[in-house]
Design a protein with these regions (language model features):
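Short, flexible segments with low predicted structural confidence
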Residues: 1-2, 17, 33-35
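Short, surface-exposed ligand-recognition loops at beta-strand->loop->(often short) alpha-helix junctions
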Residues: 9-17
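Short amphipathic alpha-helical/adjacent loop interface patches that line ligand
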Residues: 22, 26
Length: 98
């Protein structure tokens, strides 16, 4: 099991539009093979700071999903339209669950 954290900075004033668009796209993410959960969160103090936390069977499952998003063109299109800086990906192993 792997948790993927994707940190994004969104162009000021486009946060609501970005959220609306991503809420549609994330339904496809959730149904992708190997995905168990996706959380889309927004910083309370800076609305342009948005993160995705997702739970996957493995890093390979996530990488396959990411490649699909890259090949579809949606990742580049969304980044060009809304992104304000480079995204940051971090991968975490589950240590304990209570």
């Amino acid at each position: 099991m792997v948790f993927v954290n994707l940190q994004l900075k969104i162009k000021k004033g486009l946060e609501s539009e970005f959220i609306d668009e991503l809420n549609v796209l994330l339904k496809e993410t959730r149904s992708y093979e190997g995905c168990h959960a996706v959380y889309f969160i927004q910083n309370q103090d800076d609305a342009s700071n948005i993160e995705f936390c997702s739970k996957w069977d493995s890093k390979q499952h996530y990488e396959k999903y990411l490649q699909w998003r890259i090949e579809s063109g949606v990742l580049e299109e969304t980044a060009n339209k809304y992104g304000d800086g480079e995204p940051v990906w971090r991968y975490f192993d589950l240590v304990s669950e209570f």
